Design a protein with these regions (language model features):
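Conserved GTPase G-domain signal focused on the G5
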Residues: 194
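Hydrophobic alpha-helix immediately C-terminal to the catalytic Tyr-X-X-X-Lys motif of short-chain
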Residues: 166, 170, 174, 204, ...
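N-terminal Rossmann-like NAD(P)+-binding domain of SDR-like oxidoreductases, especially those catalyzing
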Residues: 1-190, 236, 240, 312, ...
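Amphipathic, non-transmembrane alpha-helical scaffold segments
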Residues: 108-111, 160, 205, 262, ...
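C-terminal substrate-binding subdomain of Rossmann-fold SDR/epimerase-dehydratase oxidoreductases
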Residues: 24, 30, 208-349
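Conserved donor sugar-nucleotide recognition element shared by glycan-biosynthetic enzymes
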Residues: 159, 167, 197, 269, ...
Length: 349
């Protein structure tokens, strides 16, 4: 019998092959947790990148991975029944604001049906704390900055945002009815090594290195609260051992809190491009384009709530974070893509 495995706290991380999920799983194993990770390894972007993230976790005997879809209620039910999880961090979701306009069903299946399966899993198999990913997109076209958790979130401007808003509503109902302790984290534009290829920083670096033109929407007059991955992981790790208590006053008995997790320092896209140019030592070709459907002008997180609860203090400035991403892209990601291209050429030869 493996005594160490039996005494370690067990955590389920959904979306473990994703950008945030893989970083979190690695951090949790190093902190002494027994981590079970699941992911459906879909083709929203290259599964090769997702597999490479998982490969970096394989050296830990305290990480187990299962390829499965959170929308599969039968498999999810068995997973929770057999897992004995102390805590759950739910990060699996169909991401992307613009992709949701053309592929709405993917968002319903993953972000709504999948989240319901997670809620049912913890209802039937109680755990100490369910932490789930919400999004800054729930603030919609809110023009009052910085965004605070008390601001209205009743007017989402994308299908993705609507699904994340629904997650918060379902979480409240389940916590109110069943006493499930939950924390929803509204992520603000996460970036860094092993990031998603559909995100702006990834696209901009790739375009500049390839000599392609960057599209800057709304004439480049958009700003985002870019948050480095290490700061995000630090925030999750800090909140994980702090399940909320039932409200002692008011109309809701839910053991639920919703918190922003961001950098608290928005960056305009024009400035972002300059920072990337400096990190690459190359100049970008830029095309100024109109506002995109479903986009918002700014995101800007107040992190006072998370700071008061955990001491959270995002530490990585945009210049340092971009430099780290560029180094990873040149060293690791380009090698990964070269391997993929070689394998493709070999298969058709």
């Amino acid at each position: 019998m493996n005594t160490e495995r039996n005494t370690r706290k067990r955590i389920l991380v959904t979306g473990a092959a994703g950008f945030i999920g893989a970083h979190l799983a690695r951090r949790l194993t190093r902190l002494g947790y027994e981590v079970t990770g699941i992911d459906n390894l879909n083709h929203y972007y290259s599964p090769l990148l997702k597999q490479a993230r998982l490969n970096a976790l394989c050296d830990s005997p305290h990480f187990r991975f299962y390829e499965m879809d959170i929308a599969d209620d039968a498999r999810m039910s068995r997973l929770f029944a057999d897992g004995g999880f102390d805590s759950v961090v739910h990060l699996a979701a169909q991401a992307g604001v613009r992709y949701s306009i053309d592929n709405p069903k993917a968002y319903v299946d993953s972000n709504i049906v999948g989240f319901m399966n997670v809620l049912e899993g913890v209802r039937r198999n109680p755990c100490n704390h369910l932490v789930f990913a919400s999004s800054s997109s729930v603030y919609g076209a809110n023009s009052s900055v910085p965004f605070r958790e008390q601001d209205t979130t009743d007017h989402p401007v994308s299908l993705y945002a609507a699904t994340k808003k629904s997650n918060e509503a379902f979480a409240h109902a389940y916590s109110h009815l069943y006493g499930i302790p939950m924390t929803g984290l509204r992520f603000f534009t996460v970036y860094g090594p092993w990031g998603r290829p559909d995100m702006a920083i990834f696209k901009f670096v790739k375009a500049i290195l390839s000599g392609e033109t960057i599209q800057l929407y709304n004439q480049g007059k958009l700003s985002r609260d870019f948050t480095y991955i290490d700061d995000i992981i630090e925030g999750i790790v800090r909140v994980l051992p702090l399940p909320p208590e039932a409200q002692s006053e008011g109309w809701s008995a839910a053991r639920l809190r919703v918190l922003n997790i961001g950098n608290n320092r928005p960056v305009e896209l024009f400035r972002l491009v300059r920072v990337i140019e400096n990190a690459l030592g190359m100049e970008a070709m830029v095309n100024l384009a109109p506002m995109q459907q479903g986009d918002v002008y700014t995101t800007y997180a107040s992190v006072d709530g998370l700071a008061a609860l955990t001491g959270y203090n995002p530490a990585v400035p945009i210049e340092e974070g971009i430099q780290a991403f560029v180094e990873w892209y040149r060293k690791d990601y380009q090698s990964l893509m070269d391997e993929q291209e070689a394998a493709t050429q070999e298969s058709v030869a």
